[in-house]
Amino acid sequence: MCKRLALVIALIIAFGIALPVIAADYATVRVLLTDFAASRRIDVGVYGSYSVDSIFTFQRGSDLVISSEQGSLIMYYEGMAYHAGDEIILRRHETAGSRENGLRLQGGLNLFEGDLHLSVQDGFVRPVLHIMTEDYLKGVVPYEMNDSFPIEALKAQAVAARTYALRNLDPSQFYDVVDNTNDQVYRGYDVSNVNAVRAIRETAGVSGMYAGAFALCYYTASNGGQTESPVNVWGGEPVPYLTIKEDPYDIENPESIVKRASVAKNPSDGVVGNSELTQVVKALLQPQLETLGYNPDLATFSILGIMDMQSAEPLYGDSSRVMRFVRMSLRLMAQKRHTVSVDPEVSIFSAAAPTQAPQGPVMPRWDAAREVTVPFTVDVPIFPDVESALQISINQKQNEILRVSDAGESFEVSMQRYGHGVGLSQRGAQQMAQKNDVTYQQILAFYYPGMELKTMETSLPLPTPVSSAFLATPGPVPTATPRPTLMPLTEKPGEGEWIAHVTGVAANSTLNLRALPDMTSDIIMQLYFGQEVLVLERLDSGWLRIKTDVIQGYVMERYVNIVK
């Protein structure tokens, strides 16, 4: 779960750690649906009680198409086009009994239970879901933590996710959170996630507080056995309840992600782990060899064995398990520089020796390669060299925890931590609830020491049901304009063709004739009630290809009456 860091840091600087709770209404969260925001069209299935602009109400199972066209939104429904301007709101109402009450988007199965606010941004449809906090969590908790997790772990996740959402409420913006890992993953409601729904229901409104403000309830998939400080991840000031501490539960969980590699102590071929790591290690050895008078050429020395191997130098102070290096103590086979002892010569002649012609550079001479008696120590950077060479990186972040253990004939290297490591570990919470029989309150107390739990009012009644009188009242008709005389159809039907009349619209309304058999296709003409047309072809999709006396196009079959 990544965070909007600039905003967090700015608020911390401005107000200190204890941020004031500024929102008075905790019942609604506004979610920018980024999964659907890069489209000029959004398909909406109505599976509940919804209305638009106090004009339209929809039967359960209705399909709408809302399209951005020339800076405006147009809603297509039952062959009708409604020009909504720059915004359209699908407003949810109370529905009878326990029937589902929400929307399905772009043909998906999950339910989006809220008011859908649609506007135009850069020519695209921008969807923002205004959803009750507890309903919002039904689309978050089972996607941040699997529905199969123990119920107390799911409850802890529900409290953390609720607290995160409430802390981010910001009436000055047009949305509070996005639906991806920049905030929290939100995917809508799947009725099969019964455990997550139970966890949300049994912790309704429970939120984490510290010094009178909503706490920073960060959470991570796995911390690798040690919680991380947000200062080490994002900078800023320390947070009293988010510190570095050992987490035995995360590391005990067999489902915590671990990547491993084996490095032989006495490689027969001089390879340390693999060829890539060997090249890195040998390159780091070259300066030492040259200083001690050994041939530094890579081809002339080899690694006989690894005497010791361990992680070294904490990256964030002595308590941190995130290390900078893997320190290796190595036995080498190398060539020592050859030295020659020359005795001085005395000439019996008094005449000076002739001047020697200048010679080129003298190439060093080397003894035969032999084992070096003194071990060499080299520090190999974990990030990126070791994790890349051994292919043990988990999430491409330079915050993973590397451990080295002695396995007899080899050293075993393991890498752990999936995510930023701050706050609640989902794998740790799973282990605590599953193997240690703890409550969600105890889980939260372990990961957020000093945080208090408080129950907030996070529910509001839905708008009253749409009245039966409103359901029976047709929407407003367009302002009457002089109706043109219908153009008579002079052409007679041929083989496989029929005469039809436009009957499925109001007497003073029109039916759109489209260029293609699609609700978003261009409108090429408007047909009036009672107008006679020639049906040329019946399509499987429910469309008809028709012809007037002047043009051909497509209409939905249910709006015409075919005369055979």
Predicted regions and their residues:
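Conserved, single-site charged/polar hotspot
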Residues: 2-510, 524-541, 551-555, 561-564
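Short, cationic motifs built from Arg/Lys/His that form the positively charged side of catalytic pockets
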Residues: 512-515
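Short alpha-helix capping/helix-loop boundary micro-motifs
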Residues: 517-522
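Short, exposed beta-strand-loop hairpins at the edges of beta-sheets
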Residues: 546-550
